[in-house]
From Swiss-Prot:
EC number: 1.3.98.5
Cofactor note: Fe-coproporphyrin III acts both as a substrate and a redox cofactor.
Family recorded in the similarity comment: Belongs to the ChdC family. Type 1 subfamily.
Gene source species: Staphylococcus aureus (strain MSSA476)
Record pathway: Porphyrin-containing compound metabolism; protoheme biosynthesis
Keyword Oxidoreductase part of the UniProt annotation: yes
UniProt binding sites for Fe-coproporphyrin III: 131, 145-149, 172, 185
Gene3D superfamilies referenced in this protein's UniProt entry, alphabetically: Apc35880, domain 1
Organism lineage string: Bacteria, Bacillati, Bacillota, Bacilli, Bacillales
Name of the molecule in the record: Coproheme decarboxylase
GO biological process: heme B biosynthetic process
Presence of keyword NADP: no
Active site: 145
EC class: oxidoreductase
Keyword annotations of the record: Heme, Heme biosynthesis, Iron, Metal-binding, Oxidoreductase
Length: 250
């Protein structure tokens, strides 16, 4: 049996994707529609207060294409807090006009593939804590996709030795480092939580960097032989004070 990688786990993560039911929303009188939007704004401003206390974070993006219109990403210390947020969100009047198109449940994760030997408690390391319990950037663009490590008769990631996996992940990581300062990456583990094994969330002020890094990594052995991917979602930052314009119907 191959040695399993150990992980450090941080905040729990919930990506929620919605399409707006514009046809139904168009039938709502403007004053009622304005009230729906105001209630939605207040809800998100209230859930965002965790950032100041460093007990979670969140991001809101307008997704490009027909897979979704909105992405709400929540990070919290406990899974049940994500349940509470989702339940309260579903009670909002605006939820009657938002159609769920996708969701992803996971937890911020760091593996030990590239970690050196140390007697230090990693959870007390400031650099590691900042990655496990992050303050999300307000970058212009976001890209999210789920992924698996392939396991079949020809290529099975889980049958490789720890040393083989460490070498592959080192080479893989070297590509990622080339994009430092251009892309901020968050890996969330989802084995036992969702249909894929990991979620990858990328932030950048230059949307083209997503294409560049994903394409370059296609030639990396870790991805070429062992990577399997779900759908990609790309979107632009939207602030709650822009909701009036976003939901406006002339």
């Amino acid at each position: 049996m191959s040695q399993a990688a150990e992980t450090l786990d941080g905040w729990y993560s919930l990506h929620l994707f919605y399409a707006v039911d514009w046809a139904s929303l168009r039938l709502v009188p403007k004053d009622e529609r304005d009230a729906l939007v105001t209630e939605f704004q207040s809800f998100l401003e209230n859930t965002a207060t965790v950032r100041s206390s460093k007990s979670g974070d969140q991001a809101i993006y307008n997704i490009t294409g027909q897979k979704a219109d909105l992405l709400l990403w929540f990070l919290r210390p406990e899974m049940k807090s994500l349940n509470h947020i989702e339940n309260e969100f579903n009670k909002l009047r605006i939820a009657d006009f938002l159609i769920p198109t996708y969701s992803y449940v996971s937890v911020i994760e760091l593996s030990n593939y590239l970690a050196g030997k140390s007697d230090e408690d990693p959870y007390e390391n400031p650099h590691i804590k900042a990655r496990l319990y992050p303050e999300l950037p307000h970058s212009d663009y976001i890209c999210f996709y789920p992924m698996n490590k392939r396991r079949n008769e020809t290529y099975n990631w889980y049958m490789l030795t720890m040393e083989e996996r460490q070498k592959l992940m080192y080479d893989h990581g070297m590509i990622g480092r080339k994009y430092a300062g251009k892309i901020k990456q968050f890996i969330t583990g989802s084995v036992g939580f969702d249909d894929f094994e990991w979620g990858v969330t990328l932030f950048s002020d230059d949307v083209l960097q997503f294409k560049k890094i994903v394409y370059e990594m296609r030639f990396d052995e870790t991805t070429a032989r062992y990577g399997e991917f779900g759908s990609f979602f790309v979107g632009h930052l939207i602030n709650t004070n822009e909701f009036d314009q976003f939901f406006a119907i002339s």
